[in-house]
Structures are given as structure tokens and as C-alpha cells.
Amino acid sequence: MSLEPVYKRVLLKASGEALMGGQGFGIDVTVADRIASDIAEARHMGVEVGVVVGGGNIFRGVAVASKGGDRVTGDHMGMLGTIINALALATSLRKLNIDTVVLSAISMPEICESFSQRATLYHLSMGRVVIFAGGTGNPFFTTDSAAALRAAEMGAEAIFKGTQVDGIYTADPKKYPDATRLDRLTHQEVLDRGLAVMDVAAVALARENSIPIIVFSIHEKGGFAEILTGGGLKTIVSDN
């Protein structure tokens, strides 16, 4: 395995649930610090990193709709949850002396900068980790879709989807011990087989922009950096 990174600019997508650790809600600071250390390791390798964090550990907009409430309001609440998570992860990165900026799709200048592609490219060029908050800024779109969109806007060479398991399996490995990990798939195969990697809109957007999706375990310390150099356990979704 080469010690040089295979990718120079990437988008890391982490679910809000990843920040919960063993808790049932909120943010486990120890877990946030560990994820931050993995991102810091990537930066020390010279990799430019953008991050999209979900908000499911704080709130899910679909929960409002399922109870008969307004989905738009629910999604706005979920977007605010992603901003809380982004600020927490930025704090963990800054503790490691990693220059970090939070760019929000929802304007709140007293708290963080507003998102624009120009600001994104500037901060990346200055060596900063850019955390994208607020999803796409629009209801009815998931943070997976936000990840694919921001990856395209920042010119990412790949989307790294950090999940609960180390890749895409033929079935849920937690329920079916004989399930096997798939090493490589195309975007179309993911769509045709209905595999729960990212939502359909996100996979389609990644396909249209020729962006590979690399699925790996967010819980494996050092796993992010290992995969950046070509090693580690993962599934690659790519048409090449």
C-alpha cells in the first residue's frame, strides 16, 4: 500500500448518528474527537477535505411528517440539527489545530459563514477543512443529496460515505452473518438493485458528475486515512 494518498480532494459524508456513539441522542464528544482525528490525519497527508454531517442524532424532518405535521418545517428543524453537528465537529478539529470553517446553506452570519462555491474553493486553497452545514438549504432533500451536490461543486475526486459497516453487503451483515461485502459496483447497479448506500437522487447526481462513492466504516479509527492511500476495507461505486 502506497503511503501517498490516491485522492487529493474528497468529500466525507458522516451521518448524525455516527456522532452519537453509544448514546441514544445528541453528540458524544469522544466520538466527535475521534472522527476529527481521522480528518486531521487526512489533512496531514495533504488531502483537501470537505465534510457533510447529517442531523439524525438531533432531529429528523420526516418524523414531523409521519405525525401529521408540516414536512417543510420538520426539514428546517433537521437542517438546524446539521448546523449543531457541524459546529461540534469544527470544535473538535480546532482542538487539534486544524484550520476549519463551517459554511451554512442557511444564512446565520453571527454563527458561521454562508455557503458559496467561491468561498468553498477559497477556503480549500488555504488548507482549511470545510464543513458544509444546513443540507442543501431546501426541504425534501437529504444530507446525502447535499453531499453529492457539494462534492460536485467543490470538484471532489470521490465521496467517502462513512457508515456503520465496512462497505456494501449482499444483505444486512448484522442480521445475516453469511452476507458478503461487495468490492465494486457501478452507480447504475446501486440504483437498479435498490441498495441503501445513499438515496437515489444522491447516487444519480454522483453518477452524472462521474464522482465515485467509497463506502467504509466511520467507526474504524484510522480507516479514513488508510482508504485514502488505497488500502482498507471498502466498497467502491464507480463507472470507471
Swiss-Prot record:
The keyword Cytoplasm belongs to this UniProt entry's keyword annotation: yes
Pfam families attached to this UniProt entry: AA_kinase
Region described as Involved in allosteric activation by GTP: spans on this chain: 21-26
Binding positions for ATP per the UniProt entry: K13, A14, S15, G16, G56, R60, T163, Q164, Y169, D172
Keywords tagged on the record: Allosteric enzyme, ATP-binding, Cytoplasm, Kinase, Nucleotide-binding, Pyrimidine biosynthesis, Transferase
Main location: cytoplasm
Binding positions (UMP): G55, D75, T136, G137, N138, P139, F140, F141, T142, T143
Subcellular location: Cytoplasm
InterPro entries: AceGlu_kinase-like_sf (IPR036393), Asp/Glu/Uridylate_kinase (IPR001048), Uridylate_kinase (IPR011817), Uridylate_kinase_bac (IPR015963)
EC number assigned by the record: 2.7.4.22
Notes on activation and inhibition: Allosterically activated by GTP. Inhibited by UTP.
Enzyme class: transferase
Catalytic activity: UMP + ATP = UDP + ADP
GO biological processes: 'de novo' CTP biosynthetic process; UDP biosynthetic process
GO MF annotation list: ATP binding; UMP kinase activity
Assembly description: Homohexamer.
Role, per record: Catalyzes the reversible phosphorylation of UMP to UDP.
UniProt record similarity statement: Belongs to the UMP kinase family.
Protein name stated in the entry: Uridylate kinase
